[in-house]
């Protein structure tokens, strides 16, 4: 959480780096030790490499943030282009991480169908972050029934 996409703020890549050194890397996808970083941030593409370097295994971004952000691929990068969620998934994979896409409860799930060729994780938060900086636990609703019906699996 960066204080822009959502009003709350939380820790970033430096803290992930410190924690990663105390946790064994997973031996399988989604296995014990997987660092699933759910990025509730305004510029999700900017931070992919930093979180990869920090030890992130699964980089989950919000669809809504991606479509309204620039395509800059580093914190100091500049771009006038908008981020394509489908291209962001490919970029995350090219950096050696699994990709996840989250959508807000108010976003129609249909926006995901064109993106989900090879998803690693799909989730829909059933609550939004609290603007009062209260701790909000996010639970997820399994939306994979739709993609599995469309794409098999």
Task: Name what the model sees in each region.
Residues 1-41, 50-53, 62, 71-74:
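An active-site metal/cofactor-coordinating segment within enzyme catalytic domains
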Residues 26-31, 46-153:
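Conserved anion-binding
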């Amino acid at each position: 959480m960066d204080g822009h996409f959502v009003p709350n703020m939380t820790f970033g890549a430096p803290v992930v780096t410190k924690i990663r050194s105390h946790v064994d890397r997973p031996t399988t996808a989604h296995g014990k030790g997987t660092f699933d970083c759910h990025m509730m941030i305004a510029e999700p593409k900017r931070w992919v490499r930093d979180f990869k370097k920090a030890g992130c295994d699964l980089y989950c971004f919000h669809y809504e943030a991606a479509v309204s952000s620039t395509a800059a691929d580093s914190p100091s990068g500049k771009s006038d282009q908008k981020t394509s969620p489908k291209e962001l998934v490919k970029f995350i994979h090219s950096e050696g991480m699994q990709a996840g896409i989250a959508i807000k409860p108010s976003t129609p799930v249909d926006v995901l169908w064109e993106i989900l060729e090879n998803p690693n994780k799909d989730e829909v938060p059933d609550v939004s972050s609290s603007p009062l900086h209260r701790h909000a636990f996010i639970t997820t609703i399994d939306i994979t029934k739709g993609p599995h019906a469309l794409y098999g699996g």
